[in-house]
Amino acid sequence: MQPTDVKNPDYFHKVVDCQWACPAHTPVPEYIRLIAAGRYSDAYMVNWESNVFPGILGRTCDRPCEPACRRSRVEEENNPKPEPVAICRLKRVAADYKDDIRGRLPKKGKSNGKKIACVGAGPASLTVARDLAPLGYQVTIFDQDPRAGGMIWSQIPRFRLPLEVIDEEVGYILDIGVEFKGGVKIDSMKKLMTEGYDALFIGSGAPRGRDLDLPGRKEGAKNIHIGIDWLSSVSFGHTSKIGKRVIVLGGGNTAMDCCRTSKRLGGEDVKVIVRSGFEEMKASPWEKEDAQHEGIPILNYLVPKKFVVESGKLTGMVFEKVKAVHENGRRDLVPTGEPDQHFDCDDVLVAVGQENAFPWIERDAGIAFDKSNMPVVDKVTMQSSAPNVFFGGDAAFGPKNIIWAVAHGHDAAVSIDKLLNGEDIAERPAPGVSLMSQKMGIHEWSYDNEIHADMRYKVPWRDIKITLKNVKAEVELGFDVATAWKEAQRCLNCDVQTVFTDRLCIECDACVDICPMDCITFTGNADEKELRNHLNAPAKNLTQDLYVSGPLKTGRVMVKDEDVCLHCGLCAERCPTGAWDMQKFLLEMTNAGPGCRSHRQKKAA
């Protein structure tokens, strides 16, 4: 193998598994260290710079960082149920215990004369506004709802996300000088294009829930509701009750929100019915656990066949029992041949997916759409076929989640800023990277001189007798300070990297002897496949890179499997020549502003 290019910003970034997995690339170990030190406001600001909504995401994020967490991998053989660090809930700690941080937020920049319109007031549009307003852009956000936040406030129940948390963090953005026009529905793209805006950002979400065209649908329409519309109606205060017997159709997070909300609005016999298996459900594992904790059964492998309507009233549903069959590399659901199953109900909530809807974008407005009736959008720049029109969030590529919408907003803001400064938006400067040597001995970066197989600490819940009676009573109470400190110490500080200097190595193999995970090997060079199988501990995880040195004095190379390294620093402490060094990796993502335009400025200079 060729020596590893550690100057490539992606190399050490990828080693910080949580940050690499986060669409907004939040520096997770950095803010966890700040929480452990009691510096909650600093931890909040580290989050705010990258993910914009720490308090909101600390309660609702889909947590792509946690399945990637190294803690789970290194404990697989020592712990019956290895669990990642509670990254998401520690984010909430920063939000819960911060001081007043308004003085640390950016102010509206001096006007540069450029106007930006954002359609939809969800997380993608708000991120665009957050990034551009301090640069002097006049940003106006339009939304048909009277309150900013989009699906954050209209579709996520208050028992998961209190309104005051939304208002606080949305308010931080609007207070930068962003104009919000609530209750204004944009019904013509061509008209908007004539209103003097230099760039348009479309963050209108995926506002249409999928329906089920089954026998009995029209006859029982009064008691058959589209899930996201029903949740919005609850948020608006238009809906405050539901029948005692409720069936929720669907296996995603919206279905989990629907069933739990139903339980609080009068539903006594509430069940979720899904066509797939339990493990294949799209809902996050913790969302399913939360529903089951509240006594809501999830019934799998049942395909809806018809709504049962008697004397004009919905009375139940009929389902066909299916099973999963794997043939020729495909997975299909086939009938089992068992009798159909009937379930009584008073109401049905249909939460089987969401779709985009762009009836307001005329097809002769210069914006290309694909065969699926989705806008053609560049996945890097977020630009449509109309040069000054950008898309993000669910409006760009279909339903995803809040943290992806934030990432899209950052990318679109960079593109808008470059476009309106006369630059090629496809030229994206690489992130800034710095590596700083850390003190040895009593570590600056680790919490303990030993790595313990510590179990994940559980977030306390409010008494279920209270929460099931009040749709606004927040269920999770968040970590207290003491528990947050203990959970923070489970972090392995993967951003403190093991950096190897070939010329200093005397090949004493002391680092090999002391490594607790056997992830360092000195061996003859070979291709990657052969090296992976001939290390002290075979490197079987192909998603994790090998760190390979240049040729050493004996002709051998140092090979380190990044997969299970604990970042404990023992190799660096033991090395007599300083060939190993522990260096803290800091990644600065390229955001809108002078940094994203630096390439052109340097060439001009």
Where are these regions (language model features)?
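FAD-site-proximal beta/loop scaffold in flavoenzymes
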Residues: 221-243, 327-399
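A conserved FAD-binding loop/helix module that cradles the flavin
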Residues: 258, 395-422
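Feature captures the FAD/FMN-dependent oxidoreductase FAD-binding
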Residues: 110, 115-119, 167-214, 306-318, ...
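Beta1-alpha1 glycine-rich phosphate/pyrophosphate-binding loop at the start
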Residues: 25-37, 44-47, 77-84, 88, ...
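Glycine/serine-rich phosphate-binding loop and adjoining beta1-alpha1 elements at the start
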Residues: 20, 24-107, 172-174, 182, ...
